[in-house]
Amino acid sequence: SDDNYEYSSDATIRAFGLDTIKKGIYYKFTIDQLKREIYNVDSLPVGSDTIIDKILIDTLNVTGWVTSGLQDTLFNNLTDSVDLREPITLKVHAADRVTTREYKITVNVHKQDPDSLIWREMSSLPTSPAANKQKSVILKNDAEEENLFVYTSTTSAYRSSLGNPAYLSWNAIEVTGMPANVDLGSIVSFKNQLFVAAPNGDIFCSNNGSTWVNAGIQEVKENKEVQNMQMSILVATLKADALTGISEETLIGILLDGGQKYFCISTDGKNWTRSKETVSNDFPVKDIYATVFTNASGIKQTVVVGKTETSAKAVVPWFTMDGLTWADMSTPSDFYCPAMENPAIMYYGGLFHMMGGKFETIYSSRVGIAWNESAEKFKYPMKKIVTPGEDEDDEEEVTYESLFKDKGDYSLTIDKNHYIWIVWNDGSIWRGRLNKLGFKIQ
């Protein structure tokens, strides 16, 4: 025949995939044709080494054929299992029998247990805060970079950039304009500013953490005029939520009017809307910690705990969707969170967690109502205690105790990289993070 056939010189891998790994999950692989590399951006779980040591490449799309090894052995991806604990090289042969391309295939596996909470002690403050008088809070600058502020009094603070969370560099800050008798524990971060209520009912704010000015309450909207509105405490913030009509971040406070306490909200710290209902006696009034939880309906809820005026056997969180109407999250069962001094709540890694008290036990909850001791891997840092047996032949007893036990007063905040920062009254600082929240892609 006079027909001439021209065979393709295409020696590229068009698609690549592995057999499912754990729990039937199919991991996506990236093909870099320039570098001739194939890899997974989202690393496989810890322990996958025992699966990928003998696994099938179930997707390998080429126009020609593939060989492997020094001998260029013909490779059949549907029957030839491979060991991908180390990178391997596959050679693609084009149909023209001349053109070839080699691809390096790398399977990335997490080396850390994703469910472990890992703690690290950081650079201490240059001086210890006064007893029961310190507050840690995060403030973003104009470039949206986070700074960790620790207020040790109403005239002094320390600041460190969190640009490199592995390293703290403390700068002493002179604080001006903050009233001398302000409760530092009630400072709230809102719209890249810090706000606090003064005992005389005024609100003070700062955009740099050092210079504070009177925010100036201008108006209160509700059923009747408030002659002399006094802000008792600033509680928390609401996140913008289209489902509930919250158009922008909103500040929540409690104001005093005629001897009664009412909730109030503001989008600027000056103009406020007051609730109709008074505040329950069981609602937290001091050292409030807040977190944001998106419920099953997709609605954002602000959830708070703190010191209450009444004593109780349990720590009961309260939640709101609009800042004006609140409900407690008490449980009729025995699965309540035991009462603890100065509790801190966080919605973190898909669960609620409660820290505080003597810092021996963390309590966890799926929706904030029924509580249990946290998972074995989600603990405070522990120290090993070895007690010798009474007699020579008796085995020694090994127990573990929280390094935070009875460390005393503290303040806690969480940054955008999911680091939990705890500042202690002796000036020591610890940083913790759940491993999986540090992985690049979930």
Indicate residue ranges for each PLM-predicted region.
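N-terminal export/ancillary region detector
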Residues: R274, D282-V292, T320, D328-S330, ...
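Predominantly extracytoplasmic/ectodomain segments of secreted and cell-surface proteins
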Residues: S1-Q134
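Blade-level signature of beta-propeller repeat domains, shared across WD40, Kelch, NHL, RCC1
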Residues: I385-Q442
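Structural signature of eukaryotic scaffold interfaces centered on beta-propeller domains
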Residues: S128-E146, A180-F195, E225-T250, P284-Q301, ...
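Loop/turn-rich, solvent-exposed surfaces of beta-rich toroidal or solenoidal domains
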Residues: F335-V386
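Beta-propeller domains
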Residues: I118-S124, L139-G177
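Beta-propeller fold detector
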Residues: D115-L125, Y167-P179, W212-E225, T273-N281, ...
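Structural motif
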Residues: T152-G163, A198-T211, G245-G269, Q301, ...
